[in-house]
Amino acid sequence: MEELTAFVSKSFDQKSKDGNGGGGGGGGKKDSITYREVLESGLARSRELGTSDSSLQDITEGGGHCPVHLFKDHVDNDKEKLKEFGTARVAEGIYECKEKREDVKSEDEDGQTKLKQRRSRTNFTLEQLNELERLFDETHYPDAFMREELSQRLGLSEARVQVWFQNRRAKCRKQENQMHKGVILGTANHLDACRVAPYVNMGALRMPFQQVQAQLQLEGVAHAHPHLHPHLAAHAPYLMFPPPPFGLPIASLAESASAAAVVAAAAKSNSKNSSIADLRLKARKHAEALGL
């Protein structure tokens, strides 16, 4: 429509100028230019562009130059069509994005479901654990027949039983390594999980007040018998920190027992010597009192 308006206005202005120029010359024939001729040429042009005849009819009835406001309706219609088209495209894009989000969400849910299935754990009852521990005490590596029999008796699958024994052996190896490194694992509860020679179950640790009491006893013995001080100093660690009844290697227990025996023998011999010295001192005092 804008092209049609520009063409009509341009044609009318050009023909008007040509007519005025010819009249001014005086010699030439004056061409009669009418507005209808311009409109007819514009009509032909509009048919080529596909414009409706109603718009040209409005221009013919209005007269004068081609008013632009007559084409406002067509421009508004075009804008509405463009707006509807754009809205449809936006809606289509939103729908596609929504579908993609739903697909991604469904994939994430599937992945989470797979992870949850992999992390499924079996909660054993106390009876099942007792049976498993009893068989583990007998052998750490049960064969397929033993696992199958145990699984049927406990109502578990053979795979679950096999996995339990694998985890149990791993736990036992870990405890063995810690015991070899001298790491004290726990308190009064025994490590009945692992039964490996030459190690035995570990007992409770000595309390701090017991250590203080042992130190006081050591100081009292050293003060009463000064001649035993070197022996007590040599074996002070064994007296201050007596070995627990359980939890140390047999070699360490034997060494501490031999050290205690040496200290006891030294104390016994020294006590005999001290008693003889006391008797001699008393006899000397008695002789002096009698004036002998």
Curated annotation (Swiss-Prot):
Motif SH3-binding per UniProt: ranges: 242-249
Annotated localization: Nucleus
Keyword Transcription regulation: yes
Assigned keywords, A-Z: Activator, Developmental protein, Disease variant, DNA-binding, Dwarfism, Homeobox, Nucleus, Transcription, Transcription regulation
Region named Disordered: 1-34, 100-119
Motif placement: OAR: 274-287
SUPFAM superfamilies linked to this entry: Homeodomain-like (SSF46689)
Induction of its expression: By retinoic acid and phorbol-12-myristate 13-acetate (PMA).
Any one Gene Ontology molecular-function term assigned to this protein's record: sequence-specific double-stranded DNA binding
Gene3D superfamilies named among the record's database cross-references: Homeodomain-like (1.10.10.60)
Main location as per UniProt: nucleus
Family: Belongs to the paired homeobox family. Bicoid subfamily.
Implicated disorder: Leri-Weill dyschondrosteosis: Dominantly inherited skeletal dysplasia characterized by moderate short stature predominantly because of short mesomelic limb segments. It is often associated with the Madelung deformity of the wrist, comprising bowing of the radius and dorsal dislocation of the distal ulna.
The protein's name in its UniProt record: Short stature homeobox protein
Organism encoding this protein: Homo sapiens (Human)
